[in-house]
Amino acid sequence: MGGGDEGLQIVIFLHPPDSFTVYPTPTPNMPIDIEELRAFKGGDPEKVRESERRRFNDPSRVDTVIALDEQWRKCRGDADNLRKAKRLVSKQFQVYAKEKKDVAPLRAQAQEFTDKIAAKEKEMVDVAAQRDALLKQLGNFVHDSVPVFEHEEAPDGTLQNAIESKHGWETRRVFPDSKDQDKEELLKRNAAPGGGPDGAMLKHHQLLQRLGGYNPEAGARVGGSRCYFLKGAGVSLNYALQMYAQNFLVNQDYTLLQPPYFMRKDVMSGVAQLAEFDEALYHVGGGDETEKGEEREKYLIATSEQPICGFHMNEWIKEKDLMANPIKYAGVSTCFRKEAGSSGRDTRGIFRVHQFEKVEQFVICHPEKSWEQHEEMLMQCKTFTQSLGLSYRVVNIVSGDLNNAAAKKYDMEAWFPGYDDFREIVSIAFVVLGWLVVVGCGSWFTSIAILFSPCCFL
């Protein structure tokens, strides 16, 4: 850990800093620690390049980051040498004063060193910003068990995600042995408010409409596309399912945590990828008049994991405590998403909507317990889904569709008879962060594993 005693803000490192000189470096949230790229300190740049290849990213970015890091370290060395030279000049002041010599030349020399140090420190900050911006774009190490494909589906429509397990059954009464064009026609007919052809199964939103619990037309008039009203039985079902999920997780020693629904930009930038800012996040302008700068700029949360990442911001977690007891939260929140990249997709039904409720597992654990915890969370999701009587399958997501933070991700997909297809209901992402803007662990060498998954949502 690094920090200062003279009024300096504590900066949390999960690897020892190169020296105890405190530099004004940024602290973004990055899946890859810069130490992984420093071969002279035991890092393995080729391992990072290979992981980028698995993600179908350009591995040359790794070399650009290494070059910028070398430039930053040279700047730091130059700044240290200038400080040493300035200290020598400062010592000469005492000698000149005793001998009653003119100290004006020394003052000029000291000022020259001061100016050079300031310029070099500014260069350090600029280079670090460039380096860290690129470092943020590097993805976490892809786990060896992840299927290496660029997309979830091959050009011929074949699923490339690995199916890990299945539970229940698939009832295909809607489109038995039908051709694609027949299937498309039946989809259109089945979308009618009264249901589909004889023997067809109604979709979930059609059932809810028949119960008087769902009104998308009124929602669109009030909030625009992908908005809806829940009414009567729909509201009751929503809250009942949330409470059921909360009680389920509390019984598994999770602590309920309801976060604020918006976050400061500087905190959000530590937990969300830049692409999400435009595609997923709603920007909230204005802010409290007492707030200044970035504190006034906020974003609505897309998932409770974002604010929960900041719950322990600037706190110290002892390694032995984390080893003994992982921190387990059940995040309960409304979520807001722009779905900017979903134009024309899933326009009917309660899919890809702008607002929904979610109960989520969120675990901070020691890396040595991380994969064990990941599997435990998957088992919790299976048990929960089975308790609802749903059929599902678990798929291991391909490397090309993992976000930068995830080393591995499971999706649970429930069988939707009305759509004759599996649809995602749960994602369980595995994230190991070498250093974090949000939390530190009491050890020089320890990283932290953060795992999260929605337990349920409507």
Task: Describe every region a protein language model picked out.
Residues D58, G168-W435, G440-S443, A449, ...:
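TRNA-recognition modules of translation machinery and tRNA-sensing kinases, especially anticodon-binding
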Residues F13, F20-Y23, F430, F445, ...:
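Aromatic (phenylalanine/tyrosine) cluster motif
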Residues E164, I448-L451:
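Short stretches within intrinsically disordered, low-complexity N-terminal or propeptide regions
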Residues E6, V11, D18, V22, ...:
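Acidic, Ala/Val/Gly-enriched low-complexity intrinsically disordered segments
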Residues M1-D5:
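Intrinsically disordered, low-complexity regions enriched in glycine and serine
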Residues Y23-E184, K188:
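N-terminal alpha-helical targeting/anchoring segments
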